[in-house]
Amino acid sequence: MRKLTLIVSAVLMVLPFISSAQKQTRDYDLKVMSYNIRMGTAKDGTNSWEYRYPATAMMIQDQKPDVFGVQEAFDFQIRFIEDNFTDYDCVGVGRDNGKSEGEHMSIFWNKKTVKMIKWGTFWLSETPEKPSKGWDAACKRTATWALMKDKNTGKMFYFVNTHLDHRGSEARRQGLNLIVSRIDEINQKGYPMVLTGDFNMKPDDAALTGLEQRMQSARKIAPKTDNHATLNLWGKGKADMVIDYIYVSGFSACTEYHTITEKYGAWKYVSDHYPIYAKLIF
């Protein structure tokens, strides 16, 4: 890990836009991002994590989100981000045992702009308080939530991050319903809310109905937006679907939504999904 940190630090030092970007005046209060990082154990040839990790670092350095949720991240990928971005901290657990094993649906935040108040994780199953697989899911699935405070405005907000099942349609429907009900339970004071994640469903899926009665898709409401697919599959196969989302509620405006298709260094893709971000105003 020390070697990776040194390599990435050297790469980041030569990025021409870093110093100028830091001086730009923000026209928003909060920048949030969702990033399916692609599991670090996957055998993807030259797109495998062992080759593309510098692109992840360059993307985070370029985008500078205040808060972002990752999906499919293994413990060593979480530690890589922590080691290379000391301004950020994170919360989350491995879905397999509630500790470090398996994929993490972690939440990262910039400690200079955001303060974390409290957090928790629940499993998308009939027994959400313990590691478990629900309904017809192929895998254990979790949602991580955090109550946070924006340091500039003093505003409180909730951030929730999840990854719905890729096979079980009932697990996706029930899992999303569970998230909606938990949101209602957790957010008793009606704070602004952000939900990020890979939902493994298209925008017209009926399973989104309950969620859309409470929250809005940043992609749909932002005046500056795009309709780009979020799944790229490394440029192979059918990659024209939107399955990654940012939903929001309680903010006065969502000024921008963007699918991050930029190329970083020698890498065309930072994952088999494109990251997405939204800029929000309290």
Predicted regions and their residues:
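N-terminal, active-site-proximal structural segment of metallo-dependent hydrolase catalytic domains
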Residues: 2-3, 19-84, 97-102, 177, ...
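Hydrophobic h-region of N-terminal signal peptides that target proteins for export
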Residues: 10-19
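Active-site-proximal beta-strand elements of phosphoester/diester hydrolases
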Residues: 29-41, 117-122, 155-165
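Acidic/histidine-rich helix-loop elements
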Residues: 34-54, 100, 124-138, 165-168, ...
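Catalytic metal-binding/acid-base residues of hydrolase active sites
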Residues: 38, 74, 163-165, 199-202, ...
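Structured beta-strand-rich core segments of catalytic domains in phosphoester-bond hydrolases
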Residues: 67-158, 253-260
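Active-site neighborhood of phospho(di)ester-bond hydrolases with catalytic His/Asp-centered motifs
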Residues: 69-71, 93, 194-198, 217-220
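Metal-dependent phosphoester-hydrolase catalytic domains
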Residues: 170, 174, 181-193, 201-282
